[in-house]
Regions:
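Small beta-barrel nucleic-acid-binding modules, primarily SNase/OB-fold domains
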Residues: 15-144
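Sec-dependent N-terminal signal peptides
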Residues: 3-13
């Protein structure tokens, strides 16, 4: 428990300073896929009064936005495709783990990675063209 708090409170600054941050790994029950690079997990390891659910954004990637957050119709379409890819990857996986690195820069989500049957969701998103590497710099447009 103390290890988790150390990670969640102290690592956010370091997470953006390095491309391979150290994290804490847990078996994960994925409750919802929010978009291509964000999932909601069950987090029974968190103490009360924290919510037993945690939004986890995949560290080191940017996927296209979907819906009203997209800057153009092609980005919205690509965002839906990225979300569908993540949902499918989660659905067909048997062993699901999450590696938590620390809070994102806005504090509402935790940065991490999903390990699905031993494969990094981050790596799968990039390899299949649904994400770009992203470490906090200005984002590239998906509308080109």
């Amino acid at each position: 428990m103390k290890q988790l708090f150390a990670v969640l409170l102290l690592v956010p600054v370091l997470a953006f300073a390095q491309k391979q941050p150290q994290g804490v790994t847990y078996d994960a029950q994925i409750l919802n896929v929010t978009d291509g690079d964000t999932v909601v997990i069950s987090a029974p390891f968190l103490p009360a009064p924290l919510k037993p659910q945690l939004a986890v954004r995949v560290f080191g990637v940017d996927t296209p936005e979907k819906g009203h957050r997209a800057m153009c119709p092609s980005e919205a379409q690509r965002g839906e495709q990225a979300s569908a890819f993540t949902k499918n990857a989660v659905a067909k996986s048997v062993k699901r783990q999450v590696v938590l690195y620390g809070w994102d820069k806005f504090g509402g989500r935790v940065l991490g990675d999903m390990i699905l049957d031993g494969q990094s969701l981050r790596a799968m998103l990039i390899a299949n063209g649904f994400a770009r590497e992203y470490y906090g710099e200005a984002k590239q447009s998906w509308c080109n």
